[in-house]
């Protein structure tokens, strides 16, 4: 499953990498598996 909900935390925003972007403002809608930015849930 390559959906944001499967890749990011249930809190809504989550890093695509273990390295957490403190701002987490980059909304990656495509290519989250590329390993950068964040995914938005819901």
Curated annotation (Swiss-Prot):
It comes from the Eukaryota. Disulfide bonds join 8-38, 16-32, 24-39. Gene3D superfamilies: 2.20.20.60. Induces the nucleation and stabilization of vaterite, one of the crystalline polymorphs of calcium carbonate. Exhibits strong antimicrobial activity against Pseudomonas aeruginosa and Proteus vulgaris. One of its GO terms (cellular component) is extracellular region. The keyword Disulfide bond applies. Its main location: secreted. The keyword Membrane does not apply. It is found in: Secreted, Extracellular space, Extracellular matrix. GO terms for biological process: biomineral tissue development; defense response to bacterium. Pfam families: Pelovaterin. This is Pelovaterin. Keywords: Antibiotic, Antimicrobial, Biomineralization, Disulfide bond, Extracellular matrix, Secreted. InterPro entries: Pelovaterin (IPR041579), Vaterite_Nuc_Antimicrob_sf (IPR053766).
